[in-house]
Amino acid sequence: MSTKTVPYTAYKVKDIELAEYGRREIELAEAEMPGLMALRKEYGASKPLKGARIAGCLHMTIQTAVLIETLVELGANVTWSSCNIFSTQDHAAAAIAAAGIPVYAWKGLTEEEFNWCIEQTLFFGEDRKPLNMILDDGGDLTNMVLDEYPELAEGIKGLSEETTTGVHRLYERMKKGTLPMPAINVNDSVTKSKFDNKYGCRESAVDAIRRATDVMLAGKRVVVCGYGDVGKGTAQSFKGAGSIVTVTEIDPICALQAAMDGFEVKQLETVLPKADIVITTTGNKDIVRPEHFEAMKDKTIVANIGHFDNEIAVSWLNEKHGDSKVEIKPQVDKYTINGKDIILLAEGRLVNLGCATGHPSFVMSNSFTNQTLAQIELWKNTDEYKNEVYMLPKHLDEKVAKLHLERIGVELTELKQDQAEYIGVTVEGPYKPEYYRY
């Protein structure tokens, strides 16, 4: 068991001179992130996160910079790393570093650098005080703490997790009895999963393919592997661009949804020979396997918008066909398999952040408002929670949504008292039971 700290490094970014450029974009994003700005106004004076030392591991983007500065405004000390080797926007990282917040992130990390950056966030300041809160995306920070620095777990009041993959890891730990602190599953808040995962991907999936390849998407045959919330948004993204979209699914309910939404649902092997683009969205492993690559036609584009790169057999590609690899431009690589060229984007990692700038600010405000509320709840009310995985209560989910309505001109109809009594709710909400599926 480790008892060491790590040497103090104030920050490490690609180029601190990019800070002014980053600051201008952060200010622009703030106007599109009304939820976070409302929390600053509501809680800025009371500082509910005072004393919290939050280590964050989440894509270091412009939108994340607004989240970080919101946590600081609410009283927290924050350190930050990125949860993906390609997702950092270097001007965003520079702006945060220039603001005096320790950040360790740059685009194009090696795996060794990736782990080093996460490790730097575990201890705060020159006196090396350990973290006491975790804000994670994918579970890499949580795993490092629990597997390599388990002695730190006792001092951690709680953690919040952003994405499907990380939530799966938390539930596995809970089942095994190895989760030593309470956790809030932010991913499955309605205002996260039905907005970030669906509407975010609906905008960013096509954006990434266009920026990376400049291909015409209208008329192209696109295979979307998976029809969960991410798959739904991704399929709609390509459909809106005029692509001919086919979905693959293991779940009969999701498969039926895809069919009723107007998509063909087929097995991957059936549609691969004619596919122009294949994109994985499942959060599972081994979706595009060696035999699938061998069945693809010349110039097929392959990408992933799930959290990790193991949805696609990237290791096999590099082991068996690495000698044919040609970098067309950063995060766009060509492999030759049986005389056919295959185009792999972002090395099989998150394509919307590797090849573009991720989701728009407005939809990320939904997710990050959830994250902020989760951190406040765990920090202030730790004793009310067991070492289990929890959801944010529905009244907070509704609050997140309400904070974003004015920005897009939404007018809510007000429920009358007798109407509220008729359906068994209060005038103020929550308006739906816990079992309601949006």
Swiss-Prot record:
Record keyword NAD present: yes
Enzyme Commission number(s) from the entry: 3.13.2.1
Protein family: Belongs to the adenosylhomocysteinase family.
Coiled-coil features, chain-numbered ranges: none
Superkingdom, natural source: Bacteria
Pathways per UniProt: Amino-acid biosynthesis; L-homocysteine biosynthesis; L-homocysteine from S-adenosyl-L-homocysteine: step 1/1
Subcellular location(s) of the protein: Cytoplasm
Protein name as catalogued: Adenosylhomocysteinase
GO terms of molecular function: adenosylhomocysteinase activity
Transmembrane segments annotated in the record for this chain: none
Organism: Christiangramia forsetii (strain DSM 17595 / CGMCC 1.15422 / KT0803)
Enzyme class, spelled out: hydrolase
Function per UniProt: May play a key role in the regulation of the intracellular concentration of adenosylhomocysteine.
GO biological process: L-homocysteine biosynthetic process; one-carbon metabolic process; S-adenosylmethionine cycle
Gene Ontology CC terms, in alphabetical order: cytosol
Residues holding NAD(+): 163-165, 197, 226-231, 249, 284, 305-307, 352
Catalytic activity: S-adenosyl-L-homocysteine + H2O = L-homocysteine + adenosine
Gene from which this protein is expressed: ahcY
